[in-house]
UniProtKB/Swiss-Prot annotation:
Subcellular location: Periplasm
Protein name listed in UniProt: Thiol:disulfide interchange protein DsbE homolog
InterPro entries: Periplasmic_diS_OxRdtase_DsbE, Redoxin, Thioredoxin-like_sf, Thioredoxin_CS, Thioredoxin_domain, Thioredoxin_ResA/DsbE_sf
Principal location listed in the UniProt entry: periplasm
Classification via Gene3D superfamilies: Glutaredoxin
Family: Belongs to the thioredoxin family. DsbE subfamily.
């Protein structure tokens, strides 16, 4: 019979330590914990592509007076579908501009036809180049832009529930109060 040695527990202890650290890292990960390098900078170009029959979003629109939102979305994105009613509500208060990310034209237009179009103007980003320039990691992401075209806040994830109420709305209200 083999004798028990404390060294036999070493591999188990090492594995448990790595598993614990990995779990802790996953649970504490907040997409906004590392702020976007774009905060305080002028919004990058939105490109020149749009969806047929929609108002073209231009770089000049981002520099017009007043607070506005730029939302990166896609019809294939479930969180984008979840936040769509919130965008519709917000569009009654301020301009909401959309950048359709890596979406076939027909799918994007079908989505907007079915669910409503909250966007005052749209850009299309079929290759994802505009999203890269903005530092977007995955849709949906929403940016608060000031009247001079500077990015004030980046919100990664859908604008829903407590996340919307506790993290996004205070930033939006702060931007609106500063105008």
């Amino acid at each position: 019979m083999a004798r028990f040695s404390p060294m036999m527990l070493l591999p188990v202890a090492i594995f448990a330590g790595f598993a614990g650290l990995s779990g802790w890292a996953l649970l504490r990960d907040d997409p906004d914990a590392l702020p976007s390098a774009m905060i305080g900078r002028e919004a990058p170009s939105v490109g020149e592509a749009t969806l047929p029959g929609k108002v073209q979003l231009t770089d000049e629109m981002l520099r017009q007076p007043g607070v506005k939102l730029v939302n990166f979305w896609a019809s294939w994105c479930p969180p984008c579908r979840a936040e769509h009613p919130t965008l519709t509500e917000l569009s009654a208060r301020l301009p909401v501009y959309g950048v359709d990310l890596k979406d076939p034209e027909g799918a994007a237009l079908g989505f907007l036809s079915e669910h409503g179009d909250p966007f005052h103007a749209l850009a299309a980003d079929p290759r994802g180049r505009v999203a890269i320039d903005w530092g977007v990691t995955a849709p949906p992401e929403t940016f608060i832009i000031d009247g001079s075209g500077r990015i004030l806040h980046r919100h990664a994830g859908p604008l829903v529930r407590e996340d919307y109420t506790n993290r996004f709305l205070p930033e939006l209200e702060k931007a609106l109060a500063a105008e």
